[in-house]
Each structure stands twice: as C-alpha cells, then as structure tokens.
C-alpha cells in the first residue's frame, strides 16, 4: 500500500517527461517546415521578377524587328526615275477652300532613251505629324499614257476637300505612278507638303439663310409689338352720343300715324292760329273803319297833287 502512492507520483512525473521528449523532435520539424515555406514565398517574387525581365528582354527584339520592317517597307516603296522629271501647277493658286474644287496640272518629262508608261495619278490628305496616317484619300486617276523619249505630257487632276476639314492643316501628298518597258515601277511624289484648308466664305448656306430669316421675323415682331403699345397709350375713350331729337318737323315720319289723329292735330293747329291772330289783332274804332271805307272810295291819284289832297282827307278823318 505504501508503494502505490510512490508509483502514482512516479507515473505523474514520468508521463509529462515522456510527452516532452516525444514532442521535441516533431516540434522542431514543424518549425523547420515553416521556415522553408517562408523562404519559398520570398524566393517566388524574385523568380517572378526575373520572368518579367526576361519577357521585356524578349519584347525589345520584337519592337526592333517591327521598326526594321517598317523601315524596309518605306525603303521598298518605289522611287522616282532619274530619267524623268515632274512639275506641278495649281490652277487657282495654292489655296485649298473647303467643299470647293481644287485643280492642278502635272507635267511629266521623259529625259531618257526609253518609253515611260504613266499609269495613274493620286492625291491624299494625311496627318501632319505622321504621313503614314491617311485623313482623306482621293480617287486615283487612271492615265495609261505612253511618253516617248525627249517628250512631255501634261495631266489634269482635281479634288474637293471635305467641308469639316476647313481651318486645319493637313499633309497633301500627290503621287505620279509610272513604269518603263522593262516593268520597273516608279513613283514620284510631285507634291508633299503641309497645307491649310481654308473655310469657304463666299455664298450662303441653308443655316445662314434660316438665321437671317429668323432675325428678320424677330425684328418685325418687336416693331409690331412696340407699335401696338404706342397705339394703346394714345387711344382715347369713345365719346358718348346724346340723342338730340329731330331738328325740324320734316324729319318726322307721319305715315305710321292714323289719318283721324292727323286731322285732329291739324284742326287744333288751325284753332290755335285763329286765337293767336285775334289776340294780336289791333283794336280799330268805328271811325277808323269809316275812314278806311272813305279811302277805298277815293279815286286813285294820278299826280302828286292828287296824293296830297287824299292825305288831307284822311287827316280830317282822324287817322
């Protein structure tokens, strides 16, 4: 019984020691594995950077190859023949109005001993900073003309710059393509310069006409409005007419009055007239009536003396 506690204590001391001894190598292995993983993660970006550098180094030769190819393409373009000479003349000067015809003449001189076959004539607008970039390519003019040695030929060409190109510079390239009897192809850049397309000033377009019509209508509307405003201020109130009646009896229409009423009105007027005459008639005495009767009985005087005697008689009667 005394050994049991000692064995138990020994077991408790020996078991942790055994566990520690077994876990020691494993733990160190795990730590070593973690360290190796970290080293691998550090080494991976280095490897990726090396790959990128290799790709850049690989791209550089390709870019150089492309530039060389472009130079070869440019150098492979046909050039002008030393046995030929070209000249150009713009008919209306070196002005290039937008949306208007530009015409020029190209002269070709054969200075060699063999015939030249002039095939075509073309023109194009290009970007001023890069002549390989086309802005507007015009139609090539087929010629197919044989120019004998020591002879000249003149060709006419015309084109119309687009209207949106007005006011901007462009590179104008005019090429004359020809070949000899052996099949050698030549190309002469007759004109290769930067020009400015000018805006068209002459003439009236639809937008300008519409703008002028709109402004004219607006001005007319303003004038009419001001006129109406002034008239409304000057306008006076209308004068009310007062009925004054008829000024004379002739203006009255009696046809609608019955005839009986008219007779009564006429009879009343006659009575009123008689009464008025009686009121205004002077009072004459009987002697005056007698003198008047005497005057009627007197003979008509023929001379001045007779008139005088008649007046004396009347004076005797008391008139």
UniProtKB/Swiss-Prot annotation:
GO cellular component, one term: endoplasmic reticulum
Biased composition (Acidic residues): 35-76
UniProt key word Cell division: no
Disordered, as annotated region: 35-84
InterPro entries: TRAP_alpha
Modified-residue entries (Phosphothreonine), positions: 261
Lumenal side: 22-208
Topological domain spans for side Cytoplasmic: 230-319
Note: Seems to bind calcium.
Family annotation (PANTHER family): TRANSLOCON-ASSOCIATED PROTEIN SUBUNIT ALPHA, TRANSLOCON-ASSOCIATED PROTEIN, ALPHA SUBUNIT
Function, in words: TRAP proteins are part of a complex whose function is to bind calcium to the ER membrane and thereby regulate the retention of ER resident proteins. May be involved in the recycling of the translocation apparatus after completion of the translocation process or may function as a membrane-bound chaperone facilitating folding of translocated proteins.
Complex and partners: Heterotetramer of TRAP-alpha, TRAP-beta, TRAP-delta and TRAP-gamma. Interacts with palmitoylated calnexin (CALX), the interaction is required for efficient folding of glycosylated proteins.
Family: Belongs to the TRAP-alpha family.
Protein name per the record: Translocon-associated protein subunit alpha
Organism name: Rattus norvegicus
């Amino acid at each position: 019984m005394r050994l049991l506690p000692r064995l138990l204590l020994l077991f408790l001391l020996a078991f942790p020691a055994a566990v520690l001894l077994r876990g020691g190598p494993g733990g160190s292995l795990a730590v070593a594995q973690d360290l190796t993983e970290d080293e691998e993660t550090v080494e991976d970006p280095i490897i990726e950077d090396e790959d990128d550098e290799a790709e850049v180094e690989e791209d550089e030769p390709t870019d150089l190859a492309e530039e060389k190819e472009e130079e070869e393409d440019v150098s492979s373009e046909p050039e002008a023949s030393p046995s030929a000479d070209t000249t150009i003349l713009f008919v209306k000067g070196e002005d290039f109005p937008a949306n208007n015809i530009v015409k020029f003449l190209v002269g070709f001189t054969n200075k060699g001993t063999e015939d030249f076959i002039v095939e075509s004539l073309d023109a194009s607008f290009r970007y001023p900073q890069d002549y390989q970039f086309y802005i507007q390519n015009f139609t090539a003019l087929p010629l197919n003309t044989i120019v004998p040695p020591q002879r000249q030929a003149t060709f006419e060409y015309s084109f119309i710059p687009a209207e949106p190109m007005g006011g901007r510079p462009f590179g104008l390239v005019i090429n004359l393509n020809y070949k000899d009897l052996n099949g050698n192809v030549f190309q002469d850049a007759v004109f290769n310069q930067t020009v400015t397309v000018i805006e068209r000033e002459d003439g009236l377009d639809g937008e300008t006409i519409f703008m002028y019509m709109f402004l004219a209508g607006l001005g007319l509307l303003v004038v009419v409005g001001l006129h109406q405003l002034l008239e409304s201020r000057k306008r006076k109130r209308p004068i009310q007419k007062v009925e004054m009646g008829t000024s004379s009896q002739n203006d009255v229409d009696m046809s609608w009055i019955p005839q009986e009423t008219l007779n009564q009105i006429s009879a009343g007027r006659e009575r009123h007239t008689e009464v008025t005459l009686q009121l205004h008639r002077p009072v004459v005495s009987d002697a005056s009536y007698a003198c008047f009767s005497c005057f009627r009985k007197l003979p008509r005087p023929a001379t001045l003396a007779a008139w005088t005697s008649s007046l004396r008689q009347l004076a005797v009667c008391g008139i």
